[in-house]
């Protein structure tokens, strides 16, 4: 992919990261993490390899980007637990003793983790939040807790398009409904489930 070759994983990116580490970062007591969307295990081992002197850890997205539909990320299907488990185990095993990983389930671009990976009903919200936190904190890597995650925050019940502020959701709604690829009802459900506004509501 041209994006990966020239923007994300450019031909001299490792050379430049090593120079930055050598000339600047190594002189201070700092920790570095690289947001590496689309990174492979092999690339992650280069970016955060213990003997590479580039970054301390990678922030990879395979476990949260893996599920989609014919319309990109816009779906209301629950995440496939077996696939999620397979991806998490792969990263744990392949980076063990070689590189360091960031552990997360949510951020400003993802729906709330309890709504996505757990059960956000009144009966199971708290148990789901605790189970997900235990999962993340018991693995090898550095856990990241996104604001509100420690409270078990769930997706917000947006019920009209006017409630949304994120242009990604608004534009996708218009594009997919006007092209007849999704009904307005299905699209409202999809952006309500996967939209970024869910993670941007006040705590």
PLM feature segments, named:
Residues 3-203:
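Active-site and adjacent substrate-binding regions of carbohydrate-active enzymes
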């Amino acid at each position: 992919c041209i994006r990966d070759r020239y923007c994300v994983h450019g031909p001299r990116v490792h050379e430049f990261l090593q120079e930055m580490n050598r000339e600047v970062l190594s002189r201070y007591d700092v920790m570095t993490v690289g947001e590496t969307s689309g990174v492979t295990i092999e690339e992650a081992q280069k970016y955060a390899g213990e003997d590479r002197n580039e970054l301390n850890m990678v922030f990879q997205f395979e476990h949260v980007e893996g599920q989609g539909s014919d319309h990109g990320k816009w779906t209301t299907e629950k995440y496939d637990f077996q696939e999620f488990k397979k991806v998490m185990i792969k990263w744990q095993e392949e980076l063990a003793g070689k590189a360091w990983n960031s552990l997360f389930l949510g951020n400003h671009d993802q729906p709330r983790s309890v709504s996505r990976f757990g059960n956000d009903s009144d009966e199971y919200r708290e148990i789901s939040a605790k189970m997900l936190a235990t999962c993340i904190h018991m693995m090898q890597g550095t856990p990241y807790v996104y604001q509100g995650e420690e409270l078990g925050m769930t997706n917000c019940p947006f019920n009209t398009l006017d409630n949304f502020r994120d242009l990604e959701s608004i534009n996708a709604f218009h594009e997919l409904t006007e092209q007849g690829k999704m009904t307005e009802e299905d699209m409202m459900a999809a952006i309500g489930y996967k939209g970024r506004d869910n993670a941007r509501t006040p705590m």
